[in-house]
Structures are given as C-alpha cells and as structure tokens.
C-alpha cells in the first residue's frame, strides 16, 4: 500500500502544474467485481482486497478516470491470467492493467480496449496490452 500512497501524493503534486496526465501499467488491482472472472473466489484476496480498491478509489477521486470504462465493453474482458491454473484457456482472468486519465483528457479519449492477440504467441506474457486512443 506504500506504493499507492506514494503514487497518490505524486499525482496530487503533478495535478497542480499539469492537468493532462496519463497513469498506466500493471496496478495489480481489479477495480471492481466485474473485472474478475469469479468475484466470490477472489473476494478479499490480493488483487481484489478492500484496501487495494480503497487506494485506487482515492486516486480516481483526484479526478482520474479508468479509461477502459469510458466505453461500453462486453463482459469477461481481462488483461491478466494466472499461468499456474491454465487460466487463459479457462477464461479465468482479471483486469489489473489500467490506463487512468485525468479529467482534461476524457474528451480526447476516443477508444479503449484490451488486445488479446499477443496471447496467441508461442511464449506469451501472463498480461496482454491495454490500449487507448487519444485525439
């Protein structure tokens, strides 16, 4: 949680001088139950704990938006699958890779999606790209 606390502090400072900010990467937090293949199974566990989600909500409360959720998305879209459980093949994923954009960029964001194409490679990552398009 220390990392999230430090990120929150950094973003508070950055927003004082720049209103166009993108924060992206592997947050290791599924923002909501709809970002988890089986919310009951993951309830309270790492990646889905109340504490982790609380810190993410604090960051969002600064004026950031989860860009993926700006657009209507079909259910069951994830960015990470555990190798140990053959989770990709079983559609047992979580959306833990996020692109957060500041309020000033919301109108510029015209698309947000997850590209599962790399998962078809011979030795893929356990994560797949999350992308946005800004105009």
Model-derived regions: residue spans:
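Amphipathic alpha-helical interface surfaces
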Residues: 3, 7, 23, 52-55
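Acidic/histidine-rich, metal-coordinating catalytic segments
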Residues: 19-33
């Amino acid at each position: 949680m220390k990392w999230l606390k430090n990120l929150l502090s950094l973003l508070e400072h950055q927003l004082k001088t720049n209103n166009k900010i993108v924060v992206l990467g592997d947050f290791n937090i599924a923002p909501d139950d709809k970002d988890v293949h089986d919310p009951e199974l993951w309830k309270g566990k790492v990646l889905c704990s109340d504490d982790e989600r609380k810190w993410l909500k604090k960051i969002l409360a600064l004026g950031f938006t989860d860009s993926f959720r700006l657009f209507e998305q079909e259910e069951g879209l994830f960015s990470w699958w555990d190798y140990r459980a053959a989770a990709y093949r079983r559609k047992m994923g979580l959306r833990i890779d996020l692109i957060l954009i500041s309020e000033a960029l919301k109108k510029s964001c015209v698309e947000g999606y997850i590209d599962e194409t790399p998962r078809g490679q011979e030795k893929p990552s356990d994560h797949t790209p999350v992308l946005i398009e800004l105009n």
